[in-house]
């Protein structure tokens, strides 16, 4: 029996030896292979196993499916399933094969992560535009299609507001700081003021000055001021924006720097205004040719302007007149030559054009016939408001605009002879045959006052009790014997601060100094010699207005009066 067993074992000797050798090799493999892989993929913990090839963690799939709702993140955290704690020979072989596959897969996985991260950020950026641009969708130039798109995507961008908004906030603050003017000596031109947001707040604060006018003393004191002299030390001959006159608020200074130096990063047509182009402006080399949705976001943050025709250059002069008089109702405007490849050739042919700041919260009626107004107002209703205000309930609707606003508007329009707002039908003077009111047959409606409508009566949602002035080019060639006194009809008082400036005789010198801040406009008009006539015209009209006030014994009100 023993000899038979021995013969059987000798027959199996080779198999036993092979089995033993295999066991030794498996033991070596178990000892030398670690239970986890090194972190060859960025962001992977060295002790985190990868799992099976082609299998991803459910969290990764959730991230990919919700890329529009989640902030951009590192997609390199592929976690997989854990390996067994007590591997056997078969597991060791599978682990070795899996490691080889992982090595060959690593470059592709990094590339995939980079692509996914870039796509994720791009999608998030578009979602942010739709969300942040919502503030501007109610403004002119945004159609219902965009509004519908925004309404469909708002739920996708809610979770990312914190990080994405902070990113854009930083970009906006950087732009505002870059455009802030500083004097040559390094002093803050507006001591105690802080950088403001270009969208502004109330019309009586960041966007249109404080309640107190820049000059609250008497006309005689203004005459003694260095600003009324023929030259102001440190101002004449200096570079543009070297020193800021006191009638400009900090928001003005920031916005003017934006309009002068901002790089065009996008454009859009303004419906029903073929000669006007809306452009987005940015500091530095941030973006180029941004999408309409991104442009909407720029405009909602106060980083846009309207490029108008060269014939509208006097809107720049009108803006400076508004600030010198302390009215603070016109939107900032500068003259500029454009060279951006994003603009059509007619905008880059070297001609000087005005660019007006785009206020993001100007309200427009949805009625196509009244889209240039914030409220519908006829001439008879306007006269009733001037006569009785809101003291007679049930007689006329109260519009919520301060009574004194109409006096400021009338003074401004009379000096510039702007007819479009209060007398677009030219009922108060004899127009030229080439005037639009004649060419369009509007003057025939003067026979029926009930048909007369006011135009460009606009307010901002930030302060709907105050008017905002647009399209202020006016008519500085209008002869004195044809001045339109209908613009003053029904007005029983004027702002005291503006009347003081007119009575001081300093208007011409103040405007000279103010306009020197816009070197492009100054040079385009031929400097002091070229501007002398138009400034004398404004000075003369101011004296005529003073005589009108004295003749009719009209009152003066302080700027704080509603």
UniProtKB/Swiss-Prot annotation:
Pfam families cross-referenced by the UniProt entry: FAM198 (PF15051)
Site (Cleavage): 111-112, 423-424
Compartment annotation: Secreted; Endoplasmic reticulum; Golgi apparatus; Membrane, Caveola
Region Disordered: start-end pairs: 179-229
Tissue specificity of this protein: Expressed in tracheal serous gland, heart, muscle, fat, lung, ovary, liver, kidney, adrenal gland and brain (at protein level).
Signal peptide: 1-29
Tagged with keyword Secreted: yes
Positions of the propeptide removed during maturation: 30-111, 424-562
Any GO CC annotation of this UniProt entry: Golgi apparatus
Keyword line: Endoplasmic reticulum, Golgi apparatus, Membrane, Secreted, Signal
Record PTM: Proteolytically cleaved. Cleaved at Arg-112 and Arg-424 leading to a processed mature product of 35 kDa. The cleavage takes place in the Golgi apparatus.
Main location: secreted
Family membership noted in the UniProt record: Belongs to the GASK family.
The protein's name: Golgi-associated kinase 1A
């Amino acid at each position: 029996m023993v000899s038979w067993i021995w013969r059987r074992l000798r027959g199996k000797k080779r198999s036993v030896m092979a089995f033993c050798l295999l066991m030794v090799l498996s033991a070596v493999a178990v000892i030398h292979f670690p239970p986890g892989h090194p972190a060859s993929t960025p962001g992977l913990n060295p002790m985190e196993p990868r799992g099976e090839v082609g299998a991803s963690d459910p969290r990764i799939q959730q991230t990919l499916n919700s890329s529009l709702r989640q902030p951009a993140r590192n997609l390199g955290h592929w976690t997989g399933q854990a390996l067994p704690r007590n591997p056997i020979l078969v597991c060791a072989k599978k682990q070795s094969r899996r490691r080889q596959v992982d090595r060959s897969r690593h470059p592709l996985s990094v590339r995939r992560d980079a692509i996914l991260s870039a796509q994720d950020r791009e999608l998030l950026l578009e979602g942010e535009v739709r969300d942040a641009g919502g503030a501007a969708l109610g403004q002119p130039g945004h159609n219902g299609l965009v509004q519908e798109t925004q309404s469909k995507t708002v739920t996708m961008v809610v979770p990312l507001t914190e990080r994405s908004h902070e990113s854009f906030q930083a970009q906006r603050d950087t732009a505002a700081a870059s455009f802030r003017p500083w004097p040559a000596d390094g002093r803050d031109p507006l001591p105690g003021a802080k950088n403001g947001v270009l969208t502004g707040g109330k019309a009586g604060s960041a966007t249109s000055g404080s309640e107190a006018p820049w000059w609250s003393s008497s006309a005689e004191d203004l005459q003694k001021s260095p600003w009324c002299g023929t030259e102001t030390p440190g101002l004449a001959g200096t570079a543009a924006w070297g020193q800021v006159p006191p009638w400009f608020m900090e928001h003005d200074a920031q916005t003017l720097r934006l309009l002068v130096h901002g790089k065009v990063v996008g454009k859009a047509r303004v419906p029903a205004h073929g000669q006007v182009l809306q452009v987005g402006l940015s500091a530095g080399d941030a973006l180029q040719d941004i999408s309409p949705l991104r442009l909407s976001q720029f405009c909602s943050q106060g980083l846009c302007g309207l490029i108008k025709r060269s014939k509208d250059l006097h809107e720049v002069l009108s803006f400076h007149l508004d600030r010198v008089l302390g009215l603070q109702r016109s939107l900032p405007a500068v003259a500029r030559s454009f060279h951006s490849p994003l603009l059509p050739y007619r905008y880059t042919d070297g001609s000087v054009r005005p660019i007006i700041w785009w206020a993001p919260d100007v309200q427009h009626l949805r009625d196509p016939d009244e889209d240039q107004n914030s409220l519908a107002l006829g001439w008879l209703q306007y006269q009733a408001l001037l006569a009785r205000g809101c003291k007679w309930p049930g007689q006329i609707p109260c519009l919520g605009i301060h009574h004194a606003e109409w006096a400021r508007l009338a003074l401004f329009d009379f000096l510039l002879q702007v007819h479009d707002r209060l007398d677009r039908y030219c009922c108060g003077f004899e127009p030229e045959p080439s005037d639009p009111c004649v060419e369009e047959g509007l003057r025939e409606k003067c026979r029926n006052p009930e048909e007369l409508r006011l135009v460009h009566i606009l307010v901002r949602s930030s302060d709907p009790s105050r008017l905002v002035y647009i399209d202020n080019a006016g008519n500085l060639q209008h002869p004195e014997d044809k001045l339109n006194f209908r613009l003053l009809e029904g007005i029983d008082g004027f702002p005291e601060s503006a009347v003081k400036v007119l009575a001081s005789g300093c208007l011409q010198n103040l405007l000279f100094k103010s306009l020197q801040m816009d070197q492009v406009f100054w040079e385009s008009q031929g400097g002091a010699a070229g501007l002398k006539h138009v400034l004398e015209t404004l000075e003369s009209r101011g004296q005529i207005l003073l005589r009108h006030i004295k003749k009719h014994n009209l009152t003066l009100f302080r700027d704080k009066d509603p």
